[in-house]
């Protein structure tokens, strides 16, 4: 049985409930880096903050003195909707008043969306389930558990192009599915779903009545073809499709904590009801910055140029080692180091000998029922440092691992 045909079933262990970065700190904490530390572990962009951020904040500091509306300011919603229409081939423009909602970054939105999805769908037979790729962004699993749903992990491997195999999901699982988390570009592998994939997933959502939660936060980091959106294949009413965006990666603003959800009108309305009670509002001055950010592409193009340089360096320095492939999107490199040892040992070795901090792939994934961990044997590198530092880290990695 190939990895891509393994049954997608709910599973987990005690460690699976914990942050991979807490586990990484515990692994590396007792040790000292062998060389001056370079961290490629956390996906925190280190490129410069756009020049307009300071002046816009200064202009709107008085707005810190009032409570924001949870829906978001009208200028922000209009700017985000206009950006979506210009960036993607949508069936029609989204209504900024009813089909788009500001978020404190995408993470809290992705978490609360699971709770909304459980209310959005009709009753399920048996235990309601939320499907997600494996490896995956940990908030997906946390959201599923908070919604009293069973997280179902769909292995993403080299055999299935690092995207969930939609044809491997059994009908009983689909019948009890509440939501399907999809990341495109994927974290950590950088794979991108094509239109046919989105269309097939939408067909399943329509047939079984679940909602697609499309995490598209890496969509603006690419070096070749621009990734598409699930909204492009959602139909004129965007029914059962909600896309999530963020300025953290696109605009080098992880500290701004501004993103949005857009799509299905009914879902967005229910989402707003929940967030009016359970979620903190986004400060108005930060929404002013985000409004300007979504109206400017020059800084995004410069951002892509800098990442392109670093992926060119990875092409040259890593070459054909460790199953390296230039990702279709995002800024992560997913290396297969299984022939050199297990991923946890490799991570510790790189830290102790090379002073390079990476993430073991097994920490980003969960065990399938048969004991298979799709992240085992891999390490993830986030190419977020400047070009010179990135080159130094990659040279150290190759020199250490051979």
Regions from the PLM with identified roles:
Residues 24, 40, 57, 80, ...:
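Generic structural signal for small/hydrophobic residues in well-ordered secondary structure
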Residues 65-203, 220-221, 225-236:
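Conserved core of the PLP fold type I
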């Amino acid at each position: 049985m190939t990895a891509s045909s393994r049954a997608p079933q709910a599973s987990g262990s005690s460690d699976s409930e914990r942050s991979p970065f807490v586990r990484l700190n515990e692994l590396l904490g007792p040790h000292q880096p062998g060389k001056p530390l370079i961290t490629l572990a956390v996906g925190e962009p280190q490129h410069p903050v756009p020049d307009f951020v300071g002046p816009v904040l200064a202009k709107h500091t008085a707005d810190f003195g009032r409570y924001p509306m949870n829906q978001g300011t009208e200028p922000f919603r209009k700017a985000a909707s206009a950006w979506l229409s210009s960036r993607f081939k949508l069936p029609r423009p989204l209504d900024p008043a009813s089909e788009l909602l500001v978020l404190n970054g995408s993470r809290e939105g992705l978490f609360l969306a699971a709770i909304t999805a459980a209310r959005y769908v009709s009753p399920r037979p048996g235990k309601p389930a939320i499907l997600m790729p494996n490896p995956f962004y940990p908030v997906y699993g946390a959201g599923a558990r908070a919604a009293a749903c069973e997280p179902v992990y769909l292995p993403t491997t080299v055999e299935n192009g690092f995207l969930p195999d939609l044809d491997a999901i059994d009908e009983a699982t689909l019948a009890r599915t509440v939501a399907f988390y999809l990341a495109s570009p994927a974290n950590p592998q950088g794979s991108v779903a094509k239109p046919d994939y989105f269309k097939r997933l939408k067909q399943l959502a329509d047939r079984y009545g679940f909602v697609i939660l499309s995490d598209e936060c890496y969509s603006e980091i690419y070096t070749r073809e621009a990734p598409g959106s699930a909204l492009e294949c959602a139909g004129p009413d965007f029914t059962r499709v909600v896309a999530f965006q963020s300025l953290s990666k696109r605009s080098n603003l992880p500290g701004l904590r501004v993103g949005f959800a857009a799509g299905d009108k009914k879902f967005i309305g229910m989402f707003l009801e929940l967030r009016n009670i359970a979620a903190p509002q986004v400060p108005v001055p930060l929404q002013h910055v985000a409004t300007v950010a979504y109206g400017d592409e020059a800084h995004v193009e410069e951002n892509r140029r800098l990442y392109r340089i670093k992926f060119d360096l990875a092409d040259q320095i890593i070459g054909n080692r460790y199953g390296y492939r230039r990702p279709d999107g995002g800024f992560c490199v997913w290396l297969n180091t299984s022939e050199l040892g297990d991923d946890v040992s490799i991570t510790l070795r790189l830290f102790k000998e090379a002073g390079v901090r990476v993430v073991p792939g097994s920490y980003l994934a969960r065990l399938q029922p048969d004991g298979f961990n799709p992240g085992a044997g891999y390490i993830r590198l986030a190419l977020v440092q400047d070009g010179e530092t990135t080159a130094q880290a990659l040279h150290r990695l190759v020199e250490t691992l051979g």
